Amino acid sequence: MKYIGSCHCGNVKFEAEGEIASAMSCNCSMCQRKGSLLWFIPRSAMRLLTPDDNAGTYQFNKHVINHRFCLTCGIHPYAEGTAPNGDATAAINIRCLEGIDLDAIPVQHYDGRAH
């Protein structure tokens, strides 16, 4: 299935393709503050619909994940990084996807504080 996602103001917009079997709630210092529910897909399954420079990038801790946010409204719709197997990966904040029933998606909790 193809989903459209964006920040609040629409200056960062993308499409993501795949099936959302579950989402991840992480308690690391960043995710806890953002309140994201993450869906991981290959980076090749995500396509930006707006210019890349509409989004800022924030890194912390080990500096291996590019947390992307809208420079206008500040919403964090996705992040980019590398999976343990070396594949380019996108972490989509499913709260930013259109037409999603969050109550229908199982949520797995990840102890990001411990890692």
Which functions belong to the PLM regions below?
Residues M1-H115:
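A short Gly-Trp-Pro
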